Amino acid sequence: VGIETEIFHIGTEAIRGCMGCGMCRKNKLGRCIFGEDAVNVVIKKMEECDGLIVGSPVHYAGASGGITSFLDRMFYSTGGFAYKPGAAIVSCRRAGSTAALEQLNKYFMMNNMPLVPSAYWNMVHGNTPEEVEQDLEGLMVMRTLGRNMAWMLKSIDAGKAHGI
C-alpha cells in the first residue's frame, strides 16, 4: 500500500554508449550531452523516485548491450542515486543469469545504493513471456522481490520520519 511503480521499456530504443567525454560532469547538470533520449528521461524520473529495479535479458552470460550502455551513461552522468534501494532481475533461457545479475548489481553497489534481495536469485527462465509464465519459482522470487522493495522503501521512509 502506498507504493507507486512505473515501467520504462528501453528494449526497442537505440541507446548510444558512453563516449567517456566527461561533458555530463563538466556541465554539472547531471545529464548526458546526447539530449533527451531515454537515459536523460530516466535520470529525471530517478530524481523523483525512491528506488529502482532494472531488468535485462541475458546475452552471452551478461546483461544486454542496450541496458549496459543505458546504465553506464545514467550512472556516470549523475551521482544522485545514493541510498535509493536498487535491484536487478534477469531473464534467460538457460545459463549465464548469475553473471548477468552480478554485472547489474555492481551499478548499485558502486553508487551507494542498498541492494534489495529476494528469496533466491532474481531471475526467471524462458525465451518468451509464455515460457516465463511457466517458471513458477522464478515468478515467486519476483513477487518476493516486490514485497522486499516495498518493505525497504517503507523502512527508509520510517527512518527519515524519525530523523535517521
Enumerate the language-model features and the residues they cover.
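Conserved beta-strand scaffold positions in the cores of enzyme catalytic domains, especially
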Residues: 5-7, 115
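Glycine-rich phosphate/pyrophosphate-binding loop and the adjoining helix
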Residues: 35, 41, 114-164
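N-terminal beta1-alpha1 ligand-phosphate binding loop
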Residues: 1-3
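Residue-level recognition of specific faces of alpha-helices
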Residues: 17-20, 45, 73, 141
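Helix-loop-strand module that forms the ligand-binding subsite of alpha/beta enzymes
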Residues: 29, 33-120
